[in-house]
Design a protein with these regions (language model features):
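Glycan-processing catalytic domains of CAZymes
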Residues: 1-142
Length: 142
């Protein structure tokens, strides 16, 4: 199992590198920002090829929506993600929270880590500007 896991990591890193190389040939300046898979950040060659990372549910919602995650899990993920901020690359964190006070606490905490927070609903069917949903422009198009 350990060998398979190591091989899966190596294959995924090689896959992301191949995508990045091909995309940047076709479109110089193409950005590669994977979602989750922060365990791969331990590999310096992987960090070198990506331009940032997106991370969902860092503080809340791993097991139960809008409930705090296990502190050990948070620390482990933050340590990995900080490898990327140490390389001066952004970490975008998406938390699925509704309560304004929880959003504000999470925002302050994520910014202290040097991460860029974003808050929305899990269905991803609306955008938020700050702590409020963005206006619905569908009515404008009628």
């Amino acid at each position: 199992m350990v060998k398979e896991k190591r091989n899966a990591r190596a294959l995924m890193i090689a896959f992301v590198k191949a995508i990045a190389e091909r995309a940047r040939v076709l479109k110089p300046g193409f950005l590669v920002v994977p979602q989750n898979a922060e365990a791969l950040l331990a590999d310096a060659s992987y960090r070198a090829v990506i331009d940032g990372i997106g991370k969902e549910d860092l503080l809340f919602g791993d097991d139960v929506s809008q409930q705090p995650n296990d502190p050990k899990s948070i620390v482990s993920d933050v340590v990995r993600l900080k490898l990327l901020t140490a390389d001066h690359k952004p970490v975008f964190v998406v938390e699925y929270l509704d309560a304004p006070q929880e959003i504000e606490r999470a925002r302050r905490r994520l910014e202290r880590y040097g991460f860029i927070p974003y808050f929305t609903d899990r269905a991803l069917d609306s955008m938020r500007i700050g702590d409020v949903p963005a206006p619905d422009h569908a009515a404008d198009k009628k």
